[in-house]
Every structure is written in structure tokens, then in C-alpha cells.
Amino acid sequence: MNIIDQVKQTLIEEITASVKAAGLAEEVPEVKVEIPKDPKNGDYSTNIAMVLTKIAKRNPHEIAQAIVDHLDKSKANVEKIEIAGPGFINFYLNNQYLTAVIPEALEKDKDFGRNEDPKHQKVLVEYVSANPTGDLHIGHARNAAVGDTLSNILDAAGYDVTREYYINDAGNQITNLAHSIEARYDQAMGKETELPADGYYGKDIINIGKDLAEKRPELKDLPEDERLKVFRQLGVDYEMEKLKKDLADFNTHFDGWFSETTLYDKGEIKKVLELMKENGYTYEADGATWLRTTDFNDDKDRVIIKKDGSYTYFLPDVAYHYDKFHRDGGQDILINLFGADHHGYINRLKASVETYGIDADRLEIQIMQMVRLMQDGEEVKMSKRTGNAITLREIMDEVGIDAARYFLTMRSPDTHFDFDMELAKENSAENPVYYAQYAHARISSILKQAGERGITPSENADFSVITNDKAIDLLKKVAEFEPMIESAAEHRAPHRVTNYIQELASAFHKFYNADKVLTDDEKKTQAYVSMIAAVQITLRNALALVGVSAPHNM
């Protein structure tokens, strides 16, 4: 249990004990303490006096006074108590307890903030999963940044996390890709060939065709069906190699790359189909096979096998989720990050897992809303260089990996977001990622100066000299790090991390502007050096959750 939770729990226990000691109730109702919106109203506040009115048969103000009179302030770590309004009890803590976070951070270092108690829950997070038919764009970039950050947060909070990319390599879009590459191959070999109407016209397809013409001239002599099969596989291989490199450069990592074709090769689709039939959730109508998803809150049943006997795109997805739930000893939770165009897909997919006996609540789906790239107040839709949609690679080249990841994680995924590319490149306090990284670099500079004076961070410094209000506010932020991670994990909210980073950096800058770290007072200097080292560890670990670097020089 982290320091903040420990202090809060102790306060609750002491309030409960004082209620009993005052004879207000034999069975004490649950005591709730909240952080007041206005810091002037204390560190914590409780409404227990009003809750006890009917039980104690006294007015809440009298009850509050009785609780205060019987409270052991020393045990509760309370410095001052005020009764406000009809009977709210406001507690002002002795904030020296916060200094305990300094040696904890120094000792744990890279593990500071991580939950030491495992959740014993396996979570598989699937994100990006773009079709291997072209470059990644800004929507995929947001999905990558949010998915990777969410996975980092869940891991830090104690979940057993698996990160996965689903390769859609068995559908019609891959057939179109193969025909497109075949046409470009033939053109490169000197043959006049038209691209299919629904083909892919990107420059990368031209390059693949030219490359294959140079390296694999023998393909022109293969029978048509064999040739198309080769082009399918080579096309997917080329595109996936490019996507993997872009994602790796974007600090986005996966534990597994799951190919849709394996569902066919291993008979997973037929297995799941039989299971759903046995469970009574399929039926025949109009020459097609339907899945009875309306039994589980979908707005209509869904076709899974068409009249011609071919599968709809929905059936492999159903089989894929069955595989995910049952793989590696079984997953407790699946989290999917989908693009905004998949909103209508949520109910049918959640309904489908119910048909083979999985509680739909174990499948969580987050929708990534649209991102607009903005430059000089105008939306940028096309690349000036290529005339096509702006790619992830171009965004990384334009604003840098750190800025791209940070900006794309700053807002809740279910909200639309304008990405100001000019702001992302600014070296100013207005740029949130620069502001955060500058705090880290500034601490490095101070620690270097301290080291030159022979002063290094110490877990055994006398922290009682830390009394400055700005220093206490800074320590409060450090102490909130682990609870923030727990909250971000529980609510699947990566943007809470970037919000926290901004608050921590702001608290540090305010402290820095209000007091000096390096002075002639050796005891205070030692304490402050140790404190800002703890702040730096916290800032570095928080930035790492977002996949952003923590530079020592800027």
C-alpha cells in the first residue's frame, strides 16, 4: 500500500475509533473521506457526522465536535481540525509524512510507482491491427500511442499483460493487394497491364512490383493461381516489414503478431462455428447462416456464412476472439482499441462472445476518435511531399517521436483531438512535452552541480527541514504517482498519466522558482538534493509509461 493510501486508511480507522469512543454508534457506518476541491478546506474531509444523525439522534455539528474531541490526532497524523457548514469535518495533516516518499523513490528507482502486489489477472491488449495494404496514418499513430501506453500502465499496476497485433491477411483486401502487385510486377517486366478498379495505387505498390521484377523474374512463368498466391504472401511480407519498422521506431512494442490465416489453417473457424451451433445460436435463413446476436443486445442478427458458402468478415473475428480468450491458459480480460469507424461493431462482437459462453464484460472495446493534424491554424490533410495522406513516418520526421507520442496520448481516446504540429516543435513552456522534459533536464543540471560539491542524494538525509509550502506540494505530487497509475489502469485512461506529468513538472518549476536547492545550509541542501532526485525518478518513470524519453540535457 502506498503512502497516501496508508495515511488515508489510518485516518479512517481513527475516525471510526473516535465514533465508538464518543458513544455515537456501536455499529459504525462506513467512513468515507474525500479530498476537498478547495485546498483551503484541508487535506481530507468527511461527512460522517451527518451520516450518524439518525443513529445518534443529535445534530450533526454536535456529533462532529464529539468525534473531534475523541480523535487521537497524533495517530491520525492530523495537525489541525475544523468543523465546517452543517457538520463537515476537515482535516489538515502533518505533511511531514510525505517526506517518507523520498527514500522510497531513491531505493526503488525504476520500480518506483509499480504495484508490488500482482493482480493475478491476465489481460490481452490488441491495438493498431492495420491492414497490411499501405502506410500507417495519423489514426493508427494515435491507436499505437494509446495502446502501448495503456499496456505499460496495466503492467505497472500489476496485471499480466500481452500486447498483440492482428494481421488481416486473409480477406478480400489482400486479394486486391495481390492483384495490384501482380499488375505492377507485369508493368515492371514490360507488359502493358491495367490495375484492377478496386486495387491499391500507392507508390509502395509500384516499388514492390519493381523490386520483385528485379529479384524474382521467374514469377512471370508461374501458373496464374500459383503466381497470385505468391504475390499475396510477398505483398503481406513487404507491408508488414515496413509497418513493424515504423511501429518499432515509434517505441510501440508487441508480444505477438497474430495472422488471420492461422485461423483457417488450424481449423479454428470451423471449431467455433460448431460450438455456436451446439449452443443453439445459429440458424439458416434466406440461404445464409446467421448468428443470433439479438439474444445479447445486438440490434439485429448477423450473417456469418453467405449464400455462396463463403464466410463474412465477421466470422473470423468471432473465431479470433475465441482463440484470444482461450490461449495461454486463458485470458481474463481482452481490450481492443478500434478506430472510430468500428463503433457499430461493438455490440455484435460483444454479443458473439456470449454465444460461446464468455461474459461480454470481459471484452472491453475502446474507440479511438479522429485526429486532425493542424498547422498554422489550418487542417493538414495531405502530405506536401507525396500528395497522399500523411503517414506515421512523416509525423515522426516532422515533430519527433517523443512529441508525437505525448500529444497523441494527452486526450481521452473517445474525444476528437486537434494535433498542433507547430506547438509540438516549440522549445517553450507552451509545449507540454518540452515543459515536462525540461523539468527533468533542469534537475539533472542541479544534481550535477551538487555532485561537484560532493553532495549526492541520500535516503538518510534529515527531511524534517523540508517545510516550504511549494516543496510540500511537490512531495504530494510524488506521493500520488502510484495511486495515479492504479486509477489510470482501472479506468483504462492513459491520458491521466500525461495530466499527472504536467502537474508534477508544474509543481517542480514552482518549487524551483520559490526556493534554492543549493545553499550554504548543508542540511537543507542535502534534503533538497535528495528530494529533487526523487522527483526526477518519478518524472522519468512517468514519461517512460508514455514511451517518451527523459533527457539530461536540452
Curated annotation (Swiss-Prot):
The lineage of its organism: Bacteria, Bacillati, Bacillota, Bacilli, Bacillales. Its EC number is 6.1.1.19. It catalyses: tRNA(Arg) + L-arginine + ATP = L-arginyl-tRNA(Arg) + AMP + diphosphate. Monomer. GO terms for molecular function: arginine-tRNA ligase activity; ATP binding. PANTHER family: ARGININE--TRNA LIGASE, CYTOPLASMIC (PTHR11956:SF5), ARGINYL-TRNA SYNTHETASE (PTHR11956). A motif ('HIGH' region) lies at residues 130-140. It is found in: Cytoplasm. This is Arginine--tRNA ligase. It comes from Staphylococcus carnosus (strain TM300). InterPro entries: aa-tRNA-synth_I_CS, Arg-tRNA-ligase, Arg-tRNA-synth_N, Arg-tRNA-synth_N_sf, ArgRS_core, DALR_anticod-bd, Rossmann-like_a/b/a_fold, tRNAsynth_Ia_anticodon-bd. Pfam families: Arg_tRNA_synt_N, DALR_1, tRNA-synt_1d. One of its GO terms (cellular component) is cytoplasm. Belongs to the class-I aminoacyl-tRNA synthetase family. SUPFAM superfamilies: Anticodon-binding domain of a subclass of class I aminoacyl-tRNA synthetases, Arginyl-tRNA synthetase (ArgRS), N-terminal 'additional' domain, Nucleotidylyl transferase. Keywords: Aminoacyl-tRNA synthetase, ATP-binding, Cytoplasm, Ligase, Nucleotide-binding, Protein biosynthesis. CDD domains: ArgRS_core. GO terms for biological process: arginyl-tRNA aminoacylation.
